[in-house]
Amino acid sequence: MRKETFMKQETIDQVIKFRDERNWKQFHTPKDLAISISLEAAELLEVFQWSRDDVWCEEKMENMREELADVLIYGIMMADTCGMNLDEIIQEKIRKNAEKYPVEKARDHKEKYTEL
């Protein structure tokens, strides 16, 4: 990933504006947003279905971009609906993961933290 900003506040604001202009917030309960995230994640997974591990990047990049964008957009809307600050919750999760997966135990291992 580039060392640029992950996501500009302007982009987050555009997502919320798009939703609000259509008066869709009334339909965006945490349950329905979680379902939508799961469905869009499944569509992202479908991009890889029946493909070899070494064939994905260039051939499927456009579909990957669209489906990943959908997952992220719904994630932004869920955070907004639940009053969560994206930067704060991501930083908190990184701290928790660092505790679960200390470098000295997790480096070069793919196992879950309970198996390290």
For the regions a language model picked out, list residue spans one by one.
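Flexible "arm" and connector segments at domain edges
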Residues: 1-68, 72-116
